[in-house]
């Protein structure tokens, strides 16, 4: 069975790709460039992950319209990337409005064309930044949209195997699957060394710290988040 895996280049999508591969799916990898600050680093990570897992069918999509729409510190240089606050429940400035719906729509289109029956995405609800499009209820609803908006014989279904996990559990899962964490990139701000201070860096560093492992990528600073 064929599956499309959305691979941003980050830790979560890396682990999801490894999970889908371990389940025996023939993988087709999709990466979306949407004008994010670290697009070059993320694209490099995507290509390295695909090479590591010998994924031959790849699609790199240009979604520059999300940059033109703006409204996020990831796509608008006039909005600063906030320093992490792991205690807040507020949606941070890094939220890209309705981004995952755009990504999933493209993944569904491609799945129909290539005959994929599953779409894997590394969404995390339990230990995420509070993004509304990372909730299980959102993906349940989107599966209904797929059912209503595709050909009658289509059997495409979104899978979110990390949705209920903590970030530290995702690290453990990655260790079990022997994933190349050193190929992944999570920083929202920097394309050199990871900043260590943005929300994504903080959650990643905390996860590794909770597991008692060193994150193999380079950081400008490595605060203690536990």
Curated annotation (Swiss-Prot):
- InterPro entries per the UniProt record, alphabetical: QueC, Rossmann-like_a/b/a_fold
> Which of this chain's residues are annotated to bind ATP?
7-17
Lineage: superkingdom: Bacteria
The enzyme's E.C. designation: 6.3.4.20
Q: What's a GO biological-process term for it?
A: queuosine biosynthetic process
User: Would the keyword Transport turn up in this protein's UniProt record?
Assistant: no
Cofactors: Zn(2+)
Q: Which Pfam families match?
A: QueC (PF06508)
List positions binding Zn(2+): 187, 195, 198, 201
Q: Which Gene3D superfamilies match?
A: HUPs (3.40.50.620)
What is catalyzed by this enzyme? 7-carboxy-7-deazaguanine + NH4(+) + ATP = 7-cyano-7-deazaguanine + ADP + phosphate + H2O + H(+)
Cofactor binding, note field: Binds 1 zinc ion per subunit.
A single MF term (Gene Ontology): ATP binding
Pathway of this protein?
Purine metabolism; 7-cyano-7-deazaguanine biosynthesis
* Keyword tags: ATP-binding, Ligase, Metal-binding, Nucleotide-binding, Queuosine biosynthesis, Zinc
Instruction: Give the protein's function.
Output: Catalyzes the ATP-dependent conversion of 7-carboxy-7-deazaguanine (CDG) to 7-cyano-7-deazaguanine (preQ(0)).
Q: Which HAMAP family match?
A: QueC
Q: Which family does it belong to?
A: Belongs to the QueC family.
The record's annotation in PANTHER family points to: 7-CYANO-7-DEAZAGUANINE SYNTHASE
| Identification of the protein by name | 7-cyano-7-deazaguanine synthase
Lineage start: Bacteria, Pseudomonadati, Chlorobiota, Chlorobiia, Chlorobiales
Please state the gene responsible for encoding this protein: queC
